[in-house]
Amino acid sequence: MIMDLQFFSHHKGGGSTANGRNSAGRRLGTKAADGSIVTAGSIIYRQRGTHINPGENVGRGGDDTLYAKVAGVVKFERMGRSKRKVSVYPVAE
């Protein structure tokens, strides 16, 4: 007579899984807050797509990053009910 006993003193093989990995965050979002002073070329907002549109004195890079074209004060504004834009207004010295 053949008996097959399993005495759970060791873990059996764990097997494998298709899950269990993740990618690092892309550090998107606001880099210069409303009312802050920026220099020309400063990144204001990093995004994928156009969540926020460029306004006065703000350019849009190839990856949709918004940056200041001139030195000044950052101002986030509404465009109607749902859209938003960011502008940079020069400071009078």
From Swiss-Prot:
Post-translational modification: The N-terminus is cleaved by ribosomal processing cysteine protease Prp.
Propeptide residues, chain positions: 1-8
InterPro entries registered for this protein in UniProt: Ribosomal_bL27 (IPR001684), Ribosomal_bL27_CS (IPR018261)
Positions of region (Disordered): 8-29
Keyword Ribosomal protein: yes
UniProt keywords, alphabetically: Ribonucleoprotein, Ribosomal protein
Keyword Ribonucleoprotein: yes
Pfam families: Ribosomal_L27 (PF01016)
PROSITE patterns associated with the record: RIBOSOMAL_L27
Gene3D superfamilies named in the record: 2.40.50.100
Family the UniProt entry places it in: Belongs to the bacterial ribosomal protein bL27 family.
Protein name: Large ribosomal subunit protein bL27
Lineage of source species: Bacteria, Bacillati, Bacillota, Bacilli, Lactobacillales
Gene: rpmA
